[in-house]
Amino acid sequence: MEIDIKKIANMFDHTRLAPDATLAEIEKLCNEAKQYGFFSVCVNPYFIEAAKKFLSGSNVLVCTVIGFPLGQNTIETKVFETKDCVAKGAHEIDMVINISKLKEGDVDYCVNEINEIKKACNGALLKVIVETCLLTPKEKELAAQIVLKSNADYIKTSTGFSTAGATFEDIEIFKKVVGNNKLIKAAGGIKTTDDLLKMISLGANRIGTSRGVELIEGLKNK
């Protein structure tokens, strides 16, 4: 199989969301993203402005997270966070859905929450994290149906801060429900180039990982 490394690198959100991340680490993240041609860097809101500065003059976008990592904030809080992040220069917002409401089957609440946040995005792209490791297969299907009904751009598997990351089953279920109507981001736990390539073949459009450099270097040796 012919592997287009440049194309795959441009599917990566190069991620550093650890609570102890330092400014020097964010600068390194941004430099790697420029060097490898990653699509974006994903950083906590505090580092949006620094990342914008480090990426100045490049095509790499800034992605951030809201309601992260538990999703348990009120809609009003998530909307405020979103507006603040967009004002500070974020191009993409990865929100965590209210997982309690999702598991209760409250579709109206979840769709409304996503749509209120999308309005606050003011044109920024919105990805909805549903934390698949906490969901049954039926709940994963429901999560995908909710995102399909909403104005979000992407459904995303995981925060990387819960019990597990993306699985092949997650991507298969999402793809079956959303088809080509929404995009899919696989995040967390993608450790090998084989996992990476399988996620993409199953329908992942974007990859969230802190191992971007390692994975691309691995592809070069394939």
Curated annotation (Swiss-Prot):
Signal peptide: none annotated. Gene3D superfamilies: Aldolase class I (3.20.20.70). One of its GO terms (molecular function) is deoxyribose-phosphate aldolase activity. Pfam families: DeoC (PF01791). SUPFAM superfamilies: Aldolase. It is found in: Cytoplasm. This is Deoxyribose-phosphate aldolase. It comes from Malacoplasma penetrans (strain HF-2) (Mycoplasma penetrans). The lineage of its organism: Bacteria, Bacillati, Mycoplasmatota, Mycoplasmoidales, Mycoplasmoidaceae. The gene is deoC.
